[in-house]
């Protein structure tokens, strides 16, 4: 007696038999991908929060250090100015330090009529004028100087600070990310200190357009950042700009953590800048 043969599966049954486990596999993989994606997004968010917090702490510490130094210089300048005001013929002296380089006297025309150590430098730009003290940027060769001035009778006492050394000691050795840096601007977006010496004393937007006039620069995002930094005392913002320390001038997504540094009745802006993507790798 012949055995009955099993009925052959139709192509639809075969397709269904293949697609059911395949569909289950696809759903499983998709679910895993969603879970992994959610976990990665949570990790990325947590990492970014941690990194920006570190940047904020770096900016706070830097601003505090600069404030202490400026107060020390202001006290030194006040002391010298009081002596000059009391004795019109006084030829003031100052003890040199790592950053204090000289003391000058200027006449009513702004001409240096006395220099304790005979240091000469060229005046570049007024950085900040407060009620009692004005802050100026000078240079001599590759050296930049912060010159703090105060009226004393018919003369102006000038304390000459080596801003290049000040930047090197307080700021340039601080590592922010793999290629980040710290810069300082005044309340009118004039660069006070920057890792690129050519940018000292220039306006952040207009000066860079002049320096890189052979390049077509999109500084719209940077301009928005500057407006926000003027209005807010501290914060962390992302924007698009260029790596000014890279000769190829690549346009990148950046993060800036910033804080106002009070200077008399004005302020400077201390800003830490890193590459947005690289900041997720290392700070």
Placement of each model-derived feature along the sequence:
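Conserved beta-strands of PAS-like sensory domains
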Residues: 141-175, 186, 192-196, 253-259, ...
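Juxtamembrane extracytoplasmic/periplasmic/luminal helical "stalk" adjacent to the first N-terminal
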Residues: 11-89, 99
């Amino acid at each position: 007696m012949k055995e009955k043969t099993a009925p052959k599966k139709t192509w639809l049954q075969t397709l269904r038999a293949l697609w059911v486990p395949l569909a289950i596999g696809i759903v499983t993989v998709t679910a895993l991908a969603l879970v992994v994606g959610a976990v990665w997004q949570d990790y990325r968010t947590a990492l970014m929060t941690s990194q920006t917090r570190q940047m904020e702490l770096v900016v706070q510490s830097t601003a505090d250090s600069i404030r202490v130094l400026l107060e020390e210089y202001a006290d030194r300048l006040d002391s010298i100015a009081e002596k000059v005001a009391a004795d019109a013929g006084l030829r003031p002296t100052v003890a040199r330090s790592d950053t204090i380089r000289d003391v000058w006297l200027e006449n009513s025309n702004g001409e240096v009529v006395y220099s304790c150590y005979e240091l000469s430098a060229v005046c570049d730009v007024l950085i900040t004028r407060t009620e009692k003290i004005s802050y100026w940027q000078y240079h001599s060769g590759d050296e930049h100087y912060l010159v703090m001035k105060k009226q004393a009778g018919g003369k102006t006492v000038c304390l000459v600070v080596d801003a290049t050394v000040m930047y090197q000691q307080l700021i340039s050795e601080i590592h922010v990310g793999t290629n980040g840096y710290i810069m300082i601007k005044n309340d009118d977006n004039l660069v006070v200190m920057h890792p690129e010496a050519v940018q000292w004393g220039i306006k952040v937007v207009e000066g860079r357009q002049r320096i890189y006039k052979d390049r077509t620069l999109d500084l719209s995002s940077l301009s928005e950042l500057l407006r926000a930094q003027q209005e807010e005392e501290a914060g962390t913002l992302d924007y698009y700009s260029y790596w000014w320390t890279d000769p190829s001038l690549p346009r990148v997504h950046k993060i800036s953590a910033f804080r106002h540094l009070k200077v008399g009745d004005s302020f400077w802006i201390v800003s830490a800048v890193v590459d947005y993507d690289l900041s997720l790798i290392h700070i």
